[in-house]
Amino acid sequence: MKRILFMGTPQFAVPSLEEFAKNFKVIGVVAQPDKPAGRGKKLTPPPTKVLAQKLGIPIYQPEKKKELIPLVEELKPDCIVVVAYGKILPKEVLDLPPYKTINLHASLLPKYRGAAPIQRAIMAGEKETGNTVMLVNEEMDAGDILAQEKIPIEEEDNFLTLSEKLAKSGAKLLVNTLRLWFEGKVKPVPQNHEEATYAPPVQKEEYRICWKASAESVRDRIRGLYPNAYTTFRGNRIKILKARVVDLEGYPGEIQDTKRLIVACGEKSLEILELISPKGKKMRGEDFMRGYRPQLYEPFNSE
């Protein structure tokens, strides 16, 4: 049985680790160090570490990338599998295993290379995305492709639901591809670099909704940045969780109804269906209207 060194950190990598633990000999899990989380800033282990400990798999959390080289030399894996590890690997590590270093990327490469392919695909209004299994090289997400699988982006999908779908389907694709790779039945296909697009990390300022954009664009931003896209109302921050486009025109950012929470955009309007109130309570738009009683045409982006 082939010896796999698994490298992954967040929840997205958990289904892949589960599948590999069932189908191969996972000799170790490499994850990012524990980080402070929550209001108490308690040191919290990454999800892959929690699963590895449960499965009795050795866990490694190097602080620096250069620590990976002696680790891989010592463990001697047949293949390194990378799923959202969180750092670019040193060149010296990539070719150490006889079956190279393989990565699962949540887009149909060469589209959406980079750290935020799921968010960016939804924010761009894409109707389809998928997973790519590829060889890792020195450039970001530019290695030869071993397998791809398409997945539709449903209208109801947001970052959370689409991430779960891609993580589960990607885990199976990765395991099946690795089996064929070990048997010599997969031929790497170079990417068309001229068609490459990029998915840079989401910046802090992008979470704030700009009502001057079209309603479709704002809705897709809310879906892609779920659950953290926000606006302000009477000086308080409100997170918008779910919205639908309404064929109604008005001044961008102003409330257009007294019973339903409808906000005008640069083109058409959005009905806010679910939100998190300033008090941190998840609620429907209609309940917000009853509780906060906003005035007709009151700005929904006021400081």
From Swiss-Prot:
- Biological process, per Gene Ontology: conversion of methionyl-tRNA to N-formyl-methionyl-tRNA
Q: Which Gene3D superfamilies match?
A: 3.40.50.12230
Keyword Protein biosynthesis among UniProt keywords: yes
Annotated SUPFAM superfamilies? FMT C-terminal domain-like, Formyltransferase
Query: InterPro entries from the xrefs?
Result: Fmt, Formyl_trans_C, Formyl_transf_N, Formyl_transf_N_sf, Formyl_transferase-like_C_sf, GART_AS, Met-tRNA-FMT_C, Met-tRNA-FMT_N
Q: What class of enzyme is it?
A: transferase
Keywords, ordered alphabetically: Protein biosynthesis, Transferase
The UniProt entry, under CDD domains, shows: FMT_core_Met-tRNA-FMT_N (cd08646), Met_tRNA_FMT_C (cd08704)
Catalytic activity, per the record? L-methionyl-tRNA(fMet) + (6R)-10-formyltetrahydrofolate = N-formyl-L-methionyl-tRNA(fMet) + (6S)-5,6,7,8-tetrahydrofolate + H(+)
A Gene Ontology molecular function term of the record: methionyl-tRNA formyltransferase activity
Enzyme Commission number = 2.1.2.9
Q: Which Pfam families match?
A: Formyl_trans_C, Formyl_trans_N
Is-annotated flag, keyword Protein biosynthesis?
yes
An annotated GO cellular component of this protein is: cytosol
Positions contributing to (6S)-5,6,7,8-tetrahydrofolate binding? S107, L108, L109, P110
UniProt-listed NCBIfam families: fmt
What does the sequence similarity comment in the record state about its family?
Belongs to the Fmt family.
Its biological purpose is as follows: Attaches a formyl group to the free amino group of methionyl-tRNA(fMet). The formyl group appears to play a dual role in the initiator identity of N-formylmethionyl-tRNA by promoting its recognition by IF2 and preventing the misappropriation of this tRNA by the elongation apparatus.
Q: This chain belongs to which protein, by name? A: Methionyl-tRNA formyltransferase
| Organism listed in the record | Aquifex aeolicus (strain VF5)
Organism classification: Bacteria, Pseudomonadati, Aquificota, Aquificia, Aquificales
